Amino acid sequence: GRRGPVRGADLRYDMEITLEKAYHGKASEITIDVAATCDTCDGSGAEPGTKVRTCNLCGGSGKMRAQQGFFVVERTCPNCHGSGQVIENPCRTCRGEGRVDKQQTLSVDIPPGVDNGTRIRLSGKGEAGPKGSPPGDLYIFLHMARHRIFERDGTTLITRCPISITTAALGGELEIPGLDGKRHKISIPAGIQSGKQLRQRGAGMPVLQGR
């Protein structure tokens, strides 16, 4: 039978985002260089107004078979390079490739709660396939920028707060700016020791949904 179309290559893009952006979620634009479908020939690789013909060597299957002993060896047709078609008049813009290098600006929807290594897939935004075949996908890998106040452990946010000896001995209250824009008040018990952890429920990172 006829060989199925060869997809374009998948692409990877590494993106650094702030902890604030990971907390709130936000659409961000990226610009990438990618092999995109040629607009002149609409990806066919043939000069507009001309036709492609079925490869006469493989009969349009894109594959060649040869008997080697007890085995049948299948390989890509050397005449049409697996496409099953031969272009007699190549497109002058893309030189018969069906794709050209372009710079594209894409919008990436970043959901709240993403973390280091979170992968976002943009279907069909990878390289265009050869001769008008389907494109690959674009995978965005997220990396968290270092934050001036918080360290992150999963959905937990950690910060270190210096307090006076008097506050440690007598107790008091501490205000910490949250990523939600609010100032969170934390009660410090009297006699607290250095290194003691205090927890503020609900003030950490949101849970990433649907992943």
For each predicted feature, which ranges?
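Charged, often glycine-enriched C-terminal and inter-domain segments
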Residues: R3-A27, F70, Q85-T93, E97-R211
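Cys/His-rich short segments
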Residues: T31-L106
